[in-house]
């Protein structure tokens, strides 16, 4: 279930609908887009500009492949940076705690 949204070189969106996907909004848009494409083919001067939408950005929106491509890489980088930050915070906390304990221990030795 899903559909592929494509962005062509003019910045216009077009999409290929998956036959297993049943979204009336997308079907209505697909129908209107097909009608616009047919109207463009009827007018030669418009057809020269919009004859074929050659996609250079493909965004695949499916239920199965949520973690694919660039999104997956960005999620991995985000988790990696989060882990580094947490590790640094924990290290600083442990260092400060040990330093405090050592200082308290030395102060108690000096008082005796």
Swiss-Prot record:
Question: Where found in the cell?
Answer: Host membrane; Virion
- Where would you say this protein principally sits, based on its record? host cell
| Entry's transmembrane regions | 66-86
**What is the membrane topology noted in the UniProt record heading this document?**
Single-pass membrane protein
Q: Which keywords belong to this entry?
A: Glycoprotein, Host membrane, Membrane, Transmembrane, Transmembrane helix, Virion
Name used for this protein in its record: Uncharacterized protein B117L
Q: Which residues are glycosylated?
A: 29, 60
Q: Which family does it belong to?
A: Belongs to the asfivirus B117L family.
The entry's cellular-component GO terms read:
host cell membrane; membrane; virion component
């Amino acid at each position: 279930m899903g559909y592929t949204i494509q962005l062509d070189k003019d910045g216009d969106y077009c999409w290929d609908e998956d036959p297993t996907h049943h979204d009336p909004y997308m079907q209505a848009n697909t129908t209107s887009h097909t009608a616009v494409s047919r109207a463009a083919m009827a007018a030669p001067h418009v057809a020269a500009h919009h004859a074929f939408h050659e996609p250079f950005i493909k965004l695949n929106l499916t239920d199965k492949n949520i973690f694919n491509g660039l999104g997956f890489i960005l999620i991995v980088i985000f988790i990696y940076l989060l882990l580094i930050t947490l590790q640094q915070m924990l290290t600083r906390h442990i260092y400060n705690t040990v330093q405090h304990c050592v200082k308290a221990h030395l102060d108690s030795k000096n008082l005796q």
